[in-house]
């Protein structure tokens, strides 16, 4: 029998339950765990910030993984996300990127595949083709601007302690597996689907923990509103471009008018995700095309909604995107792609407690169920034409795909694929790779699709979409807000440029350094800056993004110069693509015929772009790449700070050599591909007469078959060296020109490949900040070289200092031995031969070749220069900067 206290307890419990009433599900339910996979495009940042602003007890962002095969490069992307999370006080969120695993020829998916390539191109390494990614521009409006967020990333975001570190960075697959193993998770895909498709294919036992997948991408019934002609225009006056297309491939709509960038980045991966059996909600172009960043939204944002750091960062990003937009149609062409997707996903999840909400009811988008699929190949199916690695030259299709099935047709091979072009040259392209097509039948999947953005329920508002209001209000909430930006992080922050007073110094030999920003190039730059100015006067640096680092890595050059007190040295940015590799119709894009030889992961771009994880230890320079531009330089309009525009390599050269500058004949030292120098001497015939001599670090001259080159990723090319191979036509242009050339070939570089020899010299004394930094870099390179198979090649970067030391050292101690040879360079479009240097005594161009040098003297000269307190660092590190900015001035 129940006692009186028991009855009272029950009565109290029932009373509380009655008071809670309809809110009971919210009390008892746990938060929605969210995992985001992103390509870190600018609009992805908006979506991530929107999610971070939500109440963590309701929506918990538990992990972020990065798509490394689309709109960003892994090294720049991961550090930007770390900084964004640091601003928002969310250093607890794991970030995954890359991985060194592969897919074997039999279809076995090994652990930690990095997602650097679409699944159809993924082999056992991180080198490969750019079948789909070549549709993304490498420079302005493309990877350069996204990697740097138009220059605002370093200006605005605070820098925390988290960073990419070789062999310690969590991989994309590890973060996905860990987070989904922990419990039911909702996944939001904002970029390509490679990472998540690999997870699904490798971990079917974890599928039950995926509650729902929300996808931004594709176009089902969409009609592209951009590139349309005015209603009253004639054919002679206007030719429509993308107008009415399903997709948004603005660089290749003549081949494929159906696909959208996120799905096009890896159609097969998207197919796997859609057909996984997990419930999918798609927010395609159909819906996002109805919610542009229109002028009223922009002005409302600008005038009334910048009360938090995160809102300011979003607005600054939008503003520079608008100010640098290629035409005057920004307000009709830039949409709320990923942020709208995040909003729709959150609203559906919020309403999911209502069991009757089976049709995805939400506050922001109208929804409809459709039967769709993702097109991965083109009809007719089953015909082998060399375009489809899943089937071509195979007895058994990869992944046991069906012969004659939907994956067995022609697969678009790249830009302007002849099979994809209309036969007459007029009309729409024929390829549909990546098309989210509405179909019926067994291959279709029932997907919940957002069809359009809902209007604002407040008809008196200037903002005519409901999500406009929510987005601005969420970003500006005082809760879950950012702590500081880069400048407010430090109470005594001050931007300061360091320029030496050289008025009383008689300058020495004028030198221009052409670098591709490999680790060896930064070692060389330190050395050049330490040579007395009365011996070497470093006039300019020009960087080549056709080599071992991506264009946004130019910021590391600026930081190093700032450290050494040389903010007076101009830095020019070279062409994004090797000679003759640009697309003739849309030059900002092009293939990767040669640069594909560089790994995208460990020991390649990932490490070069971060200087093996040490770039963030350099002091932060006020100078950096920015997308600021001006009409004077061909931009459609002036931005707010056109004086901050990043100069091009050719412009830096022209400013240096124009009459009145008083510069005598210039010595050029090249440490990378010869793209910049080839363009300089080809664009202006007078340039050659202004060059006294050229020292070229690179090239390989083999006298015996056993004497191999160093293109370790292209087995068919046994005799070329990277700097020549990465732009063979440029190498041919320069080496066969009338220039006075000294070549520092691979064989000579190889003689200086011992990290220990160099470290022994540096260990004895490291009095200067630059010597200490170089020692740390060399110690890290040595450790990686010894520990991991992906780093066995990096000792080749040590030999790159030979050119700088030869130029700035003492011949009496270095004892260089030269020989003359007549050579020619192969540049025929054959990757098995291009970049090879041949001896041709009859028709070859005569150059000098460094055959031998005293290696002990090289090491001693390098170490002693770095340890010399003259021309030493003005500020030693970012840590030193932080202390200065945190201490009141005396």
From Swiss-Prot:
Inducing stimuli: By jasmonic acid (JA) and wounding.
EC nos: 3.2.2.7, 3.2.2.2, 3.2.2.1
Entry GO CC: apoplast
Catalytic EC class: hydrolase
Disrupted-gene phenotype: Impaired hydrolysis of inosine and adenosine by apoplastic fluid leading to an increased sensitivity to 2-chloroadenosine. The isolated apoplastic sap extracted from the double mutant missing both NSH3 and ENT3 lacks the ability to catalyze the conversion of inosine in hypoxanthine; this double mutant is unable to grow on medium containing inosine as sole nitrogen source, in addition plants are more sensitive to the necrotrophic fungus Botrytis cinerea BMM but are resistant to the cytotoxic adenosine analog 2-chloro-adenosine (CADO) and to 5-fluoro-uridine.
pH dependence, record text: Optimum pH is 4.8.
UniProt entry keywords in alphabetical sequence: Apoplast, Glycoprotein, Hydrolase, Secreted, Signal
GO molecular function: adenosine nucleosidase activity; inosine nucleosidase activity
Main localisation: secreted
Lineage top rank: taxon: Eukaryota
BP-aspect Gene Ontology terms: adenosine catabolic process; inosine catabolic process; response to jasmonic acid; response to wounding
Glycosylated sites: 55, 232, 371, 485, 580, 655, 740
Signal peptide: 1-21
Location of this chain's protein in the cell: Secreted, Extracellular space, Apoplast
CDD domains: nuc_hydro_TvIAG (cd02647)
Catalytic activity from the UniProt record: a purine D-ribonucleoside + H2O = a purine nucleobase + D-ribose; inosine + H2O = hypoxanthine + D-ribose; adenosine + H2O = D-ribose + adenine
The keyword Lipid metabolism belongs to this UniProt entry's keyword annotation: no
Family: Belongs to the IUNH family.
Primary role: Extracellular purine-specific hydrolase present in the apoplastic fluid involved in the degradation of extracellular nucleosides, including inosine and adenosine, and which may participate in wound and pathogen responses (e.g. Botrytis cinerea).
Entry protein name: Nucleoside hydrolase 3
Organism for this UniProt entry: Arabidopsis thaliana (Mouse-ear cress)
